[in-house]
Amino acid sequence: MLIPRRVKHRKQHHPGRSGAATGGTEVSFGEWGIQALSPAYVTNRQIESARIAMTRHIKRGGKVWINIYPDRPLTKKPAETRMGSGKGSPEWWVANVKPGRVLFELSGVNEEVAREALRLAIHKLPLKARIVRREGGE
């Protein structure tokens, strides 16, 4: 699981999800990628689940890059607790994903295997996404 080792502040404000991604919008490491089309919080478990789905399909060939990191804590108060008495405890870690952001990249496999592996990974994520190919000279 991806979790920060240390953080300066244990609890943070909720990050905004509006607007488009300003960086990380192009495939830069691999040949294929997953690009987000809608905003979402992606948890560390969802990232790991998508990674496992991809690596199982490509078997020993290819290389996978994860371009997002869950660096924001989301808090939750216990069930049946009265309002007030402070903010809840950190429950899970999320990556704030905006539209246009490339989440995963993949290379070293043929087109058919790459598309199927990325399709399996997209089904594990809580957002709309598309498969993109690297532009220009490889």
Curated annotation (Swiss-Prot):
Keywords: Ribonucleoprotein, Ribosomal protein, RNA-binding, rRNA-binding, tRNA-binding. Residues 1-25 are annotated as: Disordered. GO terms for cellular component: cytosolic large ribosomal subunit. GO terms for molecular function: rRNA binding; structural constituent of ribosome; tRNA binding. GO terms for biological process: translation. Gene3D superfamilies: Ribosomal protein L10e/L16. Residues 1-16 have a biased composition (Basic residues). Pfam families: Ribosomal_L16. Binds 23S rRNA and is also seen to make contacts with the A and possibly P site tRNAs. Belongs to the universal ribosomal protein uL16 family. Part of the 50S ribosomal subunit. NCBIfam families: rplP_bact. PANTHER family: 50S/60S RIBOSOMAL PROTEIN L16, LARGE RIBOSOMAL SUBUNIT PROTEIN UL16M. This is Large ribosomal subunit protein uL16.
